[in-house]
Amino acid sequence: MRVAVTGASGFCGGHVARAAAAAGHAVVGLGRRPGPVGEHRFWDAAAAGPDLSGVDLVVHCAAAVGDPAPGRRAEAAMRAVNVDGTARLLRAAAGRPVVWVSSASVYDPRRGRGLVTEDHPRANHLNAYGRTKAAGEALALAAGAVVLRPRAVYGPGDTQLLPRLLSRVRGGTLLLPGPDVELSLTAVENLADACLAAPGWAPGAYNVADGAPYARDAAVAAVLRAHGSGARIRRLPLPVAVAVARAAESAARLTGTEPALSRYAVDQLAHPVVLDLSRARAQGWTPRRTLEDYLSSRPA
C-alpha cells in the first residue's frame, strides 16, 4: 500500500512515516521538507492542494501548533493550515481513506474532564490552536475520515511538550499550577500505531493515549530526573497562576510574541484530563508504550 503522510518532516509525522515503512508500505511524505523515509512531494498546506496521485491512504499529521500570542494574526496563521489546509487535503483525497490527527485540545475546558469520551463538547477553546483544530476536524469528520485525538504527545524528537516543561525551571524550582492531578499523555509510538490501524476503523473520532493516566507531579519529577535536573516541584495556587497567565497574554498581545504563560498552559496542567480509550480499544488497538519506557530508553 502507498501511504501519504503529511507533515512527515515533523515529530508525529516522522514517526508515522517510519512506522509505515517498517510495516512494508511505500511512503510518500508531503510537506515543505523531506521526511525521514520514502518519496518527498512538496506541499505547503497554507497555499495549495497536495499531489496524491498513486496514493492509497492519507495520514494527515501536518498542523500549525503552539500557543501563540492571542490575536487575529495567530488565528489567521493557524486557520490557514489547520482549517484551509484540511479543506484542500480533503478535496485532493477525492474519496481516499483519510486518517486525520487531531488533538484533545478540541474538548471544552469548562466541562469536567475526569473521564473524557469522544462525545464531550468541543467549545470554549483557550487559544487559536484548539479553535482551529476543532474546525479542521469538523471538516474531516464530515468527509468520513477517521479522526484521532491524542493528548500531550511525547517521545523521541519531541520539540514541544517536554522541552517547554524543562525550560520553565528557574533557580532549581519548577512551579506547577494548582494541585496534583491525573493526566493522559500519549507516547508518539502509540499514536503511530493508531494511525496505521485506523484505516480499518469506522469513520468517526477516537481518543488515543497511553494505557493509564499519570499522576502529574510524579510524572514531571520522573522527567526532571531523567534529564539530569535536580529541580524541586512547587505548587502555585491556581488563582495566582490564572492571574499571571492573563497578564502574560495581555503583554503578548502588544509584543506579538508567545506569552511566557498562558491560560491554555495552566489548564493543561492544573485540571484532571483523562481520555476514555474504550472506543479505540474496541477496534483492537492497544497502547504499548509508557512514559517510563521512553525515559528509561534515553541515553544516559
What is the predicted role of each segment?
Residues 194-259, 296-299:
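Mid/C-terminal beta-alpha module of Rossmann-like enzyme folds, strongest
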Residues 124-146:
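Active-site Tyr-X1-5-Lys
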Residues 3-23:
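N-terminal Rossmann NAD(P)H-binding glycine-rich loop of SDR-like oxidoreductase domains
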Residues 87-128:
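Conserved Rossmann-fold NAD(P)-dependent oxidoreductase catalytic core, especially the SDR/UDP-sugar
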Residues 35, 43-84, 88, 92, ...:
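NAD(P)H-binding glycine-rich loop region in Rossmannoid oxidoreductase-like domains
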Residues 146-164:
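Flexible, glycine-rich beta-alpha linker
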Residues 275-300:
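Amphipathic terminal alpha-helices
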Residues 159-164, 177-199, 203-207:
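Substrate-positioning beta->alpha
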